[in-house]
């Protein structure tokens, strides 16, 4: 219904280059085949041993919310004629390094596929693994091969050759992802078509499908709920909670400054807030109001403050961003002046006016980025010398955070249910283009306004016509270094 949004951001297609693996910590995700739930240790609370889930590093998987599941099922149904994720099954998404955004899909303790956003085509692409056949029966984009071809394809990952094909779905185009089936309907592999169906039908020899390597991991389907998942992880959550509470108490004892919570409206700062409340009781909330927050974020800050009886100190300079924009243009991943101008400096002034100095507990986690992985757990930001920052959940994964929030029945930002995995400013240059596409659907008025601002700067500076369309506004130089604000 917001298809006109795509006129604002039309981007170069991603390359198929292999992305580097990023290890930020031990991958803790396991699966209990007895309870059919993810578990963050080698033993489930039910007493059963668990098995590791082979997700791509950094392995910071999260729950798939209903909107995520609806989107994935729509993508698979449009392409293969059948949805992937059945009702009542626990599904996880694991963001992996990609040219834009790519999420692995975990079902039954195995990665059964992925979805990848293709900005140049303004669509999501399904990337199934053979394991997906445990959950779906494709009716489109299928290639059926004779019995003689089955062993080499299934066991050795051989390509599908023209002589071995019994039938190919007429919808298959060159470059499409396809399921490869035996004559009796068994899925023996998946891959990418090298030619379209018509061409394949006329071929006497040659490769029709380049098969993707079959991986050993097999899912074990079974229904469960998130309440079941929380119960299965109770020993883990109790241990992580206790360690974080000890950290908060020690940090408060060693720093004489007024303790506060830096709250952004995101999941990590919410989990941190819950820990701090249990450790040392009610403390003030520091909220950095940039003027660029989502409406849902303001609602969440108010709801959290009411629920837990906390006073909110808001650092607000809503004109600072646009004044700096008029001089410098938009912020970029390698020049995030927005964090200094709209967050750090106003927060510093707020602290100085109210307490002189303070201790702030911040929802930083090492699984978020290389810089945060290397960060100390207690530090001072040079842009906010009035603030000592401390990170109680530095060792937590996103699954620890979500299961803890579910366990505590805490009011989280509902934007997470709309497909966003990180909550910040709506036009953050660190966002991938898939995120902007989602925001264009959920908040079209915000993205329309942002495009108009970019267009005026583009005209004023005489920038290349593709400066907006290609997403070049998000980067000023050629460096891959991304500035961190160290403030959640």
Which residues fall in each region the model found?
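RNA-binding accessory domains that recognize and position tRNA/RNA substrates
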Residues: 4-262, 270, 274-283, 290-293, ...
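Nucleotide-activated chemistry modules centered on ATP-dependent adenylation/adenylyltransferase
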Residues: 13, 20-37, 43, 49-52, ...
